Amino acid sequence: MSFVAYIFFNRGIASEIDGMVYIPEGEFKMGSKGKLEHGDDGGDGRIGLEVGVDEIPLHIVMVKGFYIDRYEVTNAQYKKFFDATGREPPVDSVAPDAPYNWRNGNYPAGEDNHPVVNVTWYDAEAYCKWADKRLPTEAEWEKSCRGGDGRRWSFGNSFITSFVNTHELELKWSQAVGSFPEDRSSYGVYDMSGNVMEWTASWYNPYPTSTLKRETFGEQNRVIRGGAWLTSYLTARCTSRNFAVPEKKHRTMGFRCAKDAN
């Protein structure tokens, strides 16, 4: 495995390995403090930013140092896994004839560097294991997005439509990974606020000290993070939570992998 960039002092930890970015060990503030967070949200007249009740409360989480993919896993990368393992191709079970599905073992022409979508949680987990990696936990994903300064979106605290591939931009499909250089966290991780949503390793559960009760909590749904080309600026926030059964496939859902630092 090649080591790129520099070594973190005497700890023997590279800032980047094979397309993965190092996220340092430490505490960070996870979640949201209340149902309405006030402040600058883009200068469009809104005086507050609505948050999901499952994001509450704001709490401190300790995360060990780890690596995370700089970009979402692409069609071209997934194709190597598909060819090597004979995995079921990424096809939307609800719309099997849609033009965005893989055909005859191939992804749509010209979409080599688009994020792979229509993969189940099990597909994503299997790919990461095949690549000697793993899926990131929900906490790891949020820390990677918020950076060291607790941003609302990967790029800052004000939403700017042109910075990210969400519904507001009306591109109506994913774009090649890294196409939006501003959609980049302070750690250097791209497309966390837009393009496609991403599976995580975590079960969908309430946060510590939360009294929220939902039938969807528990070991039945996996957490999905990030915004997508079909979702709004609210879903694009680093703290926004979504979920699905592990068997779910959707044209807005992809993933990226993580790896332990040691």
Positions of predicted regions on the chain:
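Short, compositionally biased
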Residues: 1-91, 121-122, 149, 158, ...
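Functional-site microenvironments in short loops/helix caps that host divalent-cation chemistry
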Residues: 22-23, 29, 34-50, 88-90, ...
